[in-house]
Amino acid sequence: MEPAYLSREYFDRYEEMLRISERLGQKLIVYDDIDFPSGTAGGRLLREYPRYTRKLLEMQEFEVCGPARFEHPLAVSDTLRCMAVSAMETASRRIVDLGAAVRRDTLAWDVPDGVWKIMFFNCRYAVHPLVDYMEPEAVERCISMTYDEYAKRFGRYFGGVVNKVFFDDVGYVSMERTWTPAITGLFESRYGRPAALYYPALFYDIGPETAAARVAFYDLRAELM
């Protein structure tokens, strides 16, 4: 795009449009990005603040026959963060929160008798240029890079020549497992139960609580949006 989005030249052109619109008695609607959907700051958000962009829920799984000793490091990096660790016995679908078995970012668990699915529930960062709509700091940063830049330069036109702004399609845009780490803590605060006992329901049938667990997680996500 020329001139580059949000560059000095870009705003110079925008000011020309505003002056012409004012002289002709016309209105101008500000669109807050350069493409669909809104929330990328023209790609700058991903380049400059990747932790504030879209995140996905991922599950890493190991099947282990007990009794056995299982050890595995947790995901700890700028792009991947472990939110919960669980184990489900495949025959009974009994679920165990393995948080207490984590030491120094490593899971070390003595697996009981049976066949167990050991699951690490991770949040992967920076999977898409779009802002993480569910993280207030991320949204504030995106606003400061876009709306605030218009307001600093063209505030006198707002409420007059500029009487509308257009924000295009808040949503998940085909990434159904869009996530944010705050959901884990919010789940535990609201329901008083470890999220690790219910994350498996997002991937498996865990029994009678499956539907309720899914609704609980997705309700929280919808509220944050």
Model-derived features with residue positions:
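Mature extracytoplasmic enzyme cores
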Residues: 5-224
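N-terminal-proximal low-complexity accessory segments that begin disordered
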Residues: 1-3
